[in-house]
Amino acid sequence: MVPNKFKLAVLVSGRGSNLQAIIDSIEKNALQAEIALVVSNVKDAYALERAHKHGLEGLFLDPKSYPDRNSYEQDLMEKIQSKSVDLICLAGYMRILGKHFIEAFSDRIINIHPSLLPAFPGLNVQKRALEHGARFSGCTVHY
C-alpha cells in the first residue's frame, strides 16, 4: 500500500456508476485511495464487471444463502476486516446494514444516497420525488 492512501471497500448492488466515479478519481490522482475490495449483494451487478475490468477483487455475497441477516453481515464484516480497510463506501448498496455492522465500523462508513435526505429515504427515491412534485432533487453523502 502506498503511504497516505485510504484503503477502501466498496459495497454495491447495481450498475456501479458510483464505483466507476471512485475508480476514475483514483486513476486521476484526485482521490488518494486504493480499492481493496468490491462486494455486491446482487449476482449479476454490472459493478462487479467494472471491478474486474480494473483488476479489483470483486465478490458476490448472496444474502439468501445465509440463515439470517446477522450471519450474512458477519461474513461480510470478516471479508472487509481481512483487507484492513480504512473506509467503507456504500455506493448504490441497496441493503440496510444492521447495528452490529455499523458499530463494528464506527466512523468508517460513508453512504451515497440518491436523494436529498430526509425528504426521500428508502428506495425509488427519484420516482417518488417526481410523483411528489419536487422542484429540485440531488443526492446526500453522509458519514
List the predicted regions and their residue ranges.
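One-carbon transfer enzymes
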Residues: 1-143
